[in-house]
């Protein structure tokens, strides 16, 4: 079970260092941005999990005259994006959990970059979004797929089956299954990008730097012995030269709401 209070706390702590470490999230934003190049001007837009504004700037550049709501669970993240893009009459900044969000309007477009992996109930999420997406409206999002950080999960499992520091990510196939007849899948792509880190500590430092350290409510602290064993186990199976390998499984989708 994902602890939303811990998610909020972790991302608030990572707000100042997010841009420094969020290389993959920036790549995802760039690729997601390609999908909006041919989009026409619309009236109401929502961005879910705006973070520090990596994707927010792309939305604003493409739709400068639209009414745009930027939403994030972390007050510190919202402060960052507000400082970055500035206050304008057509922009609204909202601190809220998307699963609790009850807008008094309907949206033409809903965007989300690298956020939906923090939502446990994916079917509930898309049912909820349907309630405030206009007929014919679009949802464009990127998220992390099931093979993300599989090296870490397998290494943890090897040293202690009870240790779990990475939430379970969803496959593209399972993601498609939670979508019912409310939506039409207009595009679905996935890619895998490998990163290299000097050691497990550097990898975990990156995760902490973007505020993505484990939000599982049953996560346990490491002992020094277990951390050393984790480093050894990881290097034994997922080493490339002097570095360790880390897999990022990235999913991109465009959904159209049926009339």
From Swiss-Prot:
Q: Which UniProt keywords apply?
A: Biotin biosynthesis, Methyltransferase, Plasmid, S-adenosyl-L-methionine, Transferase
Q: What class of enzyme is it?
A: transferase
Note whether S-adenosyl-L-methionine occurs among the keywords. Answer: yes
Any idea of its EC number? 2.1.1.197
Pathway-wise, it operates in: Cofactor biosynthesis; biotin biosynthesis
- What are the recorded GO MF terms, alphabetically? carboxyl-O-methyltransferase activity; malonyl-CoA methyltransferase activity
The record's listing under InterPro entries reads: BioC (IPR011814), SAM-dependent_MTases_sf (IPR029063)
Q: Which GO terms describe its biological process?
A: biotin biosynthetic process; methylation
NCBIfam families membership: BioC
Q: Which family does it belong to?
A: Belongs to the methyltransferase superfamily.
Could you identify this protein by its name? Answer: Malonyl-[acyl-carrier protein] O-methyltransferase 2
């Amino acid at each position: 079970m994902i602890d939303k209070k811990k998610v909020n706390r972790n991302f608030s702590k990572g707000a100042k260092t997010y841009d420094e470490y969020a290389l993959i999230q920036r790549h995802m934003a760039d690729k997601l941005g390609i999908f909006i190049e041919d989009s026409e001007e619309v009236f109401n837009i929502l961005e879910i999990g705006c973070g520090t504004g990596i994707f927010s700037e792309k939305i604003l550049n493409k739709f400068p005259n639209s009414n745009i709501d930027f939403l994030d669970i972390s007050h510190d993240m919202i402060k960052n994006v507000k400082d970055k893009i500035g206050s304008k009459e057509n922009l609204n900044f909202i601190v809220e959990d998307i699963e609790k969000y009850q807008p008094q309007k309907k949206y033409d477009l809903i965007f989300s970059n690298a956020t939906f992996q923090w939502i446990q109930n994916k079917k509930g999420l898309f049912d909820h979004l349907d309630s405030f997406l206009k007929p014919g409206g679009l949802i464009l999002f990127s998220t992390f797929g099931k093979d993300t950080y599989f090296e870490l999960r397998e290494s943890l499992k090897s040293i202690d089956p009870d240790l779990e520091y990475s939430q379970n990510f969803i496959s593209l196939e399972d993601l498609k299954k939670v979508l019912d007849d409310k939506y039409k899948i207009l595009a679905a792509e996935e890619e895998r990008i490998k990163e290299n880190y000097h050691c497990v500590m550097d990898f975990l430092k990156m995760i902490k730097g973007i505020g993505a350290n484990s939000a599982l409510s049953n996560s346990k602290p490491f002992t020094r012995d277990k951390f050393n064993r984790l480093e050894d186990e990881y290097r034994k199976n997922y080493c490339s030269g002097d570095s360790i390998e880390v897999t990022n499984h990235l999913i991109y989708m465009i959904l159209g709401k049926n009339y």
